[in-house]
Design a protein with these regions (language model features):
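Alpha-helical cap/lid subdomain in secreted, periplasmic
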Residues: 2-148, 152-170
């Protein structure tokens, strides 16, 4: 992420940056192996340290609106056949969201958390339907409903609540 900032981001001279990370950075299958707790802690620390370098670069931007996005959750609570959850992964992701929130506050940047509301919504529905998920069944990638909830949260945070945001005709 950090190494690609110049070519993929700054070279485009953005006026608004939406920054999110964490799902890939926090690892996968290792959460179901011996030493998972230590693995999660190591991945969290790496993520935190790498973000610190990126934060310094973001602080140096003039005239750029920075929005940190607490990423979508890893759904480890849905009962999905033939897809064992990676226990503890979302807790590590939530810690990443916590330091993103703190960084946004310290730097005067905007912050929007997708993880907490999507997790809460999923768990509320899972109380009646344990197989419910806002992912495509892989526990990672939001499905259409998950993306719709994220779009709602994003637009609401941008002051668009109650306003027309699209006009679609077929």
């Amino acid at each position: 992420m950090y190494r690609r900032l110049d070519g993929d981001v700054f070279s485009k001279r953005p006026t608004v940056l939406n920054v999110t990370f964490g799902m890939n950075d926090t690892g996968y299958a290792e959460y179901n192996q011996p030493g998972a707790g230590e693995f999660g802690e190591r991945r969290y620390r790496e993520c935190y340290e790498n973000y610190g370098r990126m934060e310094q670069r973001l602080q140096g931007l003039d005239g750029v609106r920075v929005v940190l996005l607490g990423g979508a959750p890893y759904d480890e609570t849905a009962q999905i056949e033939k897809n064992a959850p990676l226990r503890g992964k979302n807790a590590v992701l939530q810690r990443v969201v916590d330091f993103q929130r703190a960084s946004a506050g310290e730097n005067g940047w905007e912050f929007l958390d997708f993880n907490t509301p999507l997790t809460e919504l999923s768990q509320r529905v899972q109380a009646d339907d344990p197989s419910f998920t806002l992912t495509m069944g892989d526990r990672i990638h939001p499905d259409n409903d998950g993306h719709m909830v994220m779009a709602y949260l994003y637009l609401k945070a941008q002051g668009m609540a109650g306003k027309k945001v699209a006009d679609v005709r077929i």
